Amino acid sequence: MNSSRVVFPANFSYEDPLPFECNEDPNVVLSLAMYGMQSSYLIVGAVLNVMIVYTVFHGNSYRDNSFYMLYCADAIVGIYINTAEVIFGRIFIYITPLCPIASPYFFTPSILTKMYYAALHYSLGFKTFSQIFMSFNRMTCVIFLMKHLKLWKQILKPVLIITFILPLGVIWKILLSRVYINPNGAGFSVNYKDYFPWANISILHLFHFTLCFVLVIIFFVATILGLTMLKQRIKSAERSLTIVTMIMAVQTVTFASIQIYFVFFAAYTPKIRSVLLQIVSFVFDSLYVFSPIALIVMSRQLRKDIFNLKDKETQISMYPNSEL
């Protein structure tokens, strides 16, 4: 008889089925409303990122700007993750009537759940590295004013390649381990069983989160100090992209701080842990939802190009092909 939780057999092997019974949902309407709300803002984030990527790659002036190329790499990963969450991850958590219908298909090893779970953790690793490089990009634009363009023409391609490769250092463990589903409320979510106990996925993420936390704060402070020493016309030109980067940095550092807390302090502060468990998914969602909104709101020229707006005002705007 199935239980309402996953039970690992004493001599568990990779191919063993891991069945469970779905929990009863006391409020199906609320669960469906939660899915509707979360899927709505995830779709908005994905659509806005698609519009930004399309605009950047169809405008030479944007492609010449290293920041926009770094952002597009981050946006492409965000589009994939938002889409995967809407059509897979959140569906089976919140559309609870699907649990008894769909869960038996995933009691045995599934390539679908493995791809989803690996991509989810890849995106976490990718986000930390992309935020480091975007923050570094803004710092060099302010600190190394005359050398910024030349520097990024030389390092942009290697940086993009590194950004896509480094997160593989996290997901190799998932690819070799058993990925399974477990009850989550009245639905189910995806988890994994360690194949290498000495290389816990949280520890692998911890290295990236800690590195991101330290470097982003350093770049953030250096950028602010640099802006205070620039002429007003330069500060006006850089303010939009710098503010966007700062918003993204705060989001990423907040998420990294929560993950660091879970590794080191969660066992000692159960009350705080329960609160953070409720908000951590929202913080994760914000990484790929608020960023495109902030970029479109703050970049006047990009907003005009995306929505085909005609500017009849005479005030000076920030053009994308100028990184200075």
From Swiss-Prot:
Keywords noted in UniProt: Membrane, Transmembrane, Transmembrane helix
Molecular function GO labels: transmembrane signaling receptor activity
Membrane topology according to the record: Multi-pass membrane protein
BP-aspect Gene Ontology terms: sensory perception of chemical stimulus
Record-linked Pfam families: Srg
Classification via SUPFAM superfamilies: Family A G protein-coupled receptor-like (SSF81321)
Protein family per UniProt: Belongs to the nematode receptor-like protein srg family.
Protein name: Serpentine receptor class gamma-10
Gene behind this protein: srg-10
